[in-house]
């Protein structure tokens, strides 16, 4: 018997079935960088409209975690999709290089500055350490397939960037936003420095809970105001969880509109907010109480009470922050240790106490508590309160308390002389709030979030008492502490030196070089700038300076949702203060990475997944696909199981691509492409399907909805292609003549689809797209890399006069699904095996009957059965199925199985020269080839 295998057009491609991404990706990366891919993209994009995504700088310390991977991959997807949409998309990655975490790490290696090593040597060690960290992190970002100007990133410790940061400070001063003052700031005892709002985390802490008596100075005056008597001494009762602040108490705050009660409590009288009398009585375990009288808070102003253990008295003052949500309605006020306390104390001309030093200990002249660390002093304060009879009740409470984000230790509010950007100076708060409304926030709830934060944020303390940071580079008068009158000129001179020598130039600077004779009256400000000032000013030091950005405002900032109070906030404050406008047009935020149960990644739980583990095992494309397929607007769940699911989705996409490529074997577009109006109907429909998918995918990319891109891509690969079109065309691809219209029409469709598909996936599955690109049929003038291409423009829609329109094929899909259901039943009943063993009779109602008749004898190819007959539903001898108006009968196909096409036919053996195969195959092997019109 003749072997007809060689007469078939079997699929063939060098594109492997298995991705083996972990092995193949590094070689692709090497090729990208050997060929300078990023610069190729820049070159081909020259002259196009620019889209600027300004990279928020990760901190140059430690290993990358999945949050870093999510962030950089999202940015890369956007940049690549924007390139494909016709934009010039320069991407300059950056790093945040100054600040405490690096100092602490370097201290552990070389010791503290000015102890074992000079400050200058320490700064150099910090610079070298940061460079090492940048190199490590950079290698990992590159391994993820992220394209950018990795050879020329921006570092906040680059000399030119440090100089630009100083110039931004000069603009802040020039515009009247800077002032010096003593205000309570978040202070970390371990850092020995103030903290920014964004560096504060809230964790549960167990603290003492104390109710304290402040005995009245004039009991008669109080009896008169309340118009009540009673028995025993009178006290105002406060509640606090920070006993260590009691030595700094300078007032008691009450609300003028609240009602206050004079309460008989056993053998003493106490003042409490009326609403809270019952809850306080319960908390202090009072057996009984009697409200003697009540008055409005406004009548009690300036009553005075003895400090619990110091020989001075403190007044009642009004404060709008006083509520009845807890406590006693009378608020212990220590101006050094709380923002509200500070504000109302200043309003009432009450001085701060200044009892705590930079080391977090009571100063040597503080009575009873000299030298004690603040938290250690709690018990001593409680003992003193007991000793003086001021302690009404002691308990313990677990509550949310501010902690340092680095040390994970409790912090304090502490008043220190610092430099601030004033939120009310020159209308900065109002300006920033107005700018928020001009920005597109994605998701849109981000607008309300940052609006609330800006509306309520305190003045920004920008000074730090650190060694490794950009200096404030100012001189102040020895006596008045006023800035030198030539401060702006001096800052520019310093900036010019820093541009050449780095920040050490400031500490090496002899004041006489810039001040002349004034040098004897002025001294250098020793502080460095908050690192949030460094990163917050990159709109000026990077976006306004790099030539590829053309001085434009950034189109987008993209970071995690914690950056509303971090980088988004600091950038907005500085840009509003210096330029009078927001530094960004769009802000996109993504959620945090959690495990499948919604828990944070934690070594103690054992749920940490390291990015390098993923790409070393599965490949970076699997990591990228997980990022893209996850809705980033919420928490992003990940586990090994979830990554395996991403692997399954990847295989579906890869298998689709492989089918397309393997069936383009021998297809040369310039020679073999079939014009749209000459293509077979089903092929035209497949291309129009791809166009519809492309429109959806491009729209999803434009709206940054990457999970929608993946869903639409999967639908196209699995439903429209995998379970319908690609299944149907196998017979035509494999069995018709190699150069027949039937086959070339199909190959033309597959080629268009492959050209489109590779561009759709390139922003997400970058390595796989590069691999597919290298296996596509050669086209003259084709770029070497898919990443320099735009979305495919040669897809076409169905002709408006085409009777077999999209609606027609959608109905055919539904009919075929019903036929497949009945075929599956027949298989289960052992009536048939494969679908080609079947003869189906389709009984259709008046609406569907003409649809099926249009295909004539080619209906069987759509249904993938050997025979298909169409009859009116009225003739049916089987019941309707799940599709109304349709009944399907399945019988065994007539005739024998053709060994070449596997269809059953009754004419096998009737052709003398080819008596083993069916007449259709004879025509394809020895004749002119069968003619197809529809499928």
UniProtKB/Swiss-Prot annotation:
Binds 1 zinc ion per subunit. Coiled coil: none annotated. Keywords: Aminoacyl-tRNA synthetase, ATP-binding, Cytoplasm, Ligase, Metal-binding, Nucleotide-binding, Protein biosynthesis, Zinc. Its cofactor is Zn(2+). It is found in: Cytoplasm. It comes from the Bacteria. One of its GO terms (biological process) is isoleucyl-tRNA aminoacylation. PANTHER family: ISOLEUCINE--TRNA LIGASE, MITOCHONDRIAL (PTHR42765:SF1), SOLEUCYL-TRNA SYNTHETASE (PTHR42765). Catalyzes the attachment of isoleucine to tRNA(Ile). As IleRS can inadvertently accommodate and process structurally similar amino acids such as valine, to avoid such errors it has two additional distinct tRNA(Ile)-dependent editing activities. One activity is designated as 'pretransfer' editing and involves the hydrolysis of activated Val-AMP. The other activity is designated 'posttransfer' editing and involves deacylation of mischarged Val-tRNA(Ile). This is Isoleucine--tRNA ligase. It comes from Haemophilus ducreyi (strain 35000HP / ATCC 700724). The gene is ileS.
């Amino acid at each position: 018997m003749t072997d007809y295998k060689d007469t078939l057009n079997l699929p063939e491609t060098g594109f492997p079935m298995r991705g083996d991404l972990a092995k193949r990706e590094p070689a692709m990366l090497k090729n990208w960088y050997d060929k300078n891919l990023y610069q190729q993209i820049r070159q081909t994009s020259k002259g196009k409209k620019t889209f600027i995504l300004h990279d928020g700088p990760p901190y140059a310390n430690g290993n990358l975690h999945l949050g870093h991977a999510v962030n950089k991959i999202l940015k890369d997807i956007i940049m690549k999709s924007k390139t494909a949409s016709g934009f010039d998309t320069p991407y300059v990655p950056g790093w945040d290089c100054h600040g405490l975490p690096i100092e602490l790490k370097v201290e552990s290696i070389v010791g503290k500055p000015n102890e074992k090593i000079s400050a200058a040597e320490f700064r150099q060690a910090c610079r070298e350490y940061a460079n090492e960290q940048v190199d490590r992190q950079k290698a990992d970002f590159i391994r993820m397939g992220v394209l950018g100007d990795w050879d020329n990133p921006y570092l906040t410790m680059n000399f030119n960037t440090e100089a630009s940061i100083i110039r931004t400070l000069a603009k802040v001063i020039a515009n009247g936003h800077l002032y010096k003052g003593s205000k309570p700031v978040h202070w970390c005892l371990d850092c020995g420095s103030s903290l920014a709002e964004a560096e504060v985390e809230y964790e549960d802490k167990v603290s003492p809970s104390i109710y304290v008596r402040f005995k009245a100075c004039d009991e008669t005056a109080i009896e008169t105001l309340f118009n009540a008597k009673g028995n025993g001494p009178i006290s105002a009762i406060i509640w606090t969880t920070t006993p260590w602040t009691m030595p700094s108490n300078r007032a008691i705050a009450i609300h003028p509109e609240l009602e206050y009660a004079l309460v008989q409590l056993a053998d003493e009288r106490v003042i409490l907010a009326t609403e809270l009398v019952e809850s306080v009585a319960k908390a202090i375990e009072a057996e009984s109480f009697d409200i003697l009288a009540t008055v409005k808070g406004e009548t009690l102003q300036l009553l005075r009470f003895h400090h619990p253990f110091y020989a001075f008295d403190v007044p009642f003052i009004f404060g709008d922050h006083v509520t009845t949500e807890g406590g006693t309605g009378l608020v212990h006020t220590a101006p050094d240790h709380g923002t509200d306390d500070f504000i109302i104390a200043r309003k009432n001309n009450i001085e701060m106490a200044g009892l705590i030093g930079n080391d977090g200990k009571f100063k040597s002249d503080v009575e009873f508590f000299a030298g004690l660390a603040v938290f250690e002093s709690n018990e001593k304060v409680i003992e003193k309160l007991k000793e003086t009879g001021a302690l009404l009740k002691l308990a313990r409470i677990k509550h949310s308390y501010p902690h340092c984000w680095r040390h994970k230790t409790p912090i304090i509010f502490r008043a220190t002389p610092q430099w601030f950007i004033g939120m009310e100076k020159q209308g900065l708060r109002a300006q920033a709030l107005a700018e928020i409304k001009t920005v597109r926030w994605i998701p849109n709830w981000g607008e309300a979030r940052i609006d609330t934060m800006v509306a309520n944020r305190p003045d920004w303390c920008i000074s730090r008492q650190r060694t490794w940071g950009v200096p404030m580079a100012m001189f102040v008068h020895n006596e008045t502490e006023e800035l030198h009158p030539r401060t702006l000129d001096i800052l520019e001179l310093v900036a010019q030196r820093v541009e050449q020598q780095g920040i050490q130039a400031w500490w090496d600077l002899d004041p006489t070089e810039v001040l002349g004779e004034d040098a004897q009256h002025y001294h250098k400000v020793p502080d460095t700038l908050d690192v949030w000032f460094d990163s917050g000013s990159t709109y000026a030091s990077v976006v306004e300076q790099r030539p590829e950005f053309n001085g434009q405002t950034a189109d987008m900032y993209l970071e995690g949702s914690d950056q509303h109070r971090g980088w988004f906030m600091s950038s907005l404050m500085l840009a509003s203060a210096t330029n009078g406008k927001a530094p960004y047009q769009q802000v996109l935020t993504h959620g945090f990475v959690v495990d499948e149960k919604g828990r944070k990644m934690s070594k103690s739980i054992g749920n940490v997944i390291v990015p390098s583990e993923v790409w070393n095992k599965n490949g970076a494309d699997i990591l990228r696909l997980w990022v893209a397929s996850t809705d980033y607007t919420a928490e992003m769940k990940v586990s090994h199981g979830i990554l395996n699911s991403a692997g399954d989705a990847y295989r579906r996409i890869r298998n689709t691509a492989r089918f397309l490529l393997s069936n383009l074997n021998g297809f040369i577009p310039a020679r073999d492409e079939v014009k749209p109006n000459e293509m077979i109907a089903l092929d035209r429909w497949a291309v129009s399907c791809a166009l519809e998918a492309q429109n959806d995918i491009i729209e999803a990319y434009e709206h940054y909805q990457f999970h929608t891109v993946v869903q639409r891509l999967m639908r196209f690969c699995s439903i429209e292609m995998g379970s319908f079109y690609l299944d149907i065309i196998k017979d035509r691809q494999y069995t018709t003549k190699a150069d027949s219209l039937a086959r070339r029409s199909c190959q033309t469709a597959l080629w268009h689809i492959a050209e489109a598909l590779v561009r759709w996936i390139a922003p997400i599955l970058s390595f796989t797209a590069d691999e597919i690109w290298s296996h596509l049929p050669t086209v003259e003038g084709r770029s070497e890399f898919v990443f320099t291409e735009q979305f495919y423009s040669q897809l076409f829609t169905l002709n408006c006069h085409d009777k077999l329109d999209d609606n027609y094929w959608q109905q055919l899909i539904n009919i075929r699904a019903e036929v497949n259901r009945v075929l599956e039943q027949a298989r289960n009943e052992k009536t048939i095996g494969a679908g080609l063993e079947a003869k189906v009779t389709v009984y259709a109602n008046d609406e569907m009957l003409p649809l099926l008749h249009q295909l004539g004898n080619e209906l069987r190819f759509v249904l993938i059965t050997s025979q298909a007959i169409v009859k009116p539903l009225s003739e049916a001898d089987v019941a309707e199925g799940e599709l109304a108006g349709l009944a399907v009968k399945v019988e065994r196909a007539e005739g024998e199985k053709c060994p070449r096409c596997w269809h059953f036919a009754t004419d096998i053996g009737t052709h003398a020269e080819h008596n083993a195969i069916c007449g259709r195959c004879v025509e394809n092997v020895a004749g002119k080839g069968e003619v197809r019109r529809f499928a």
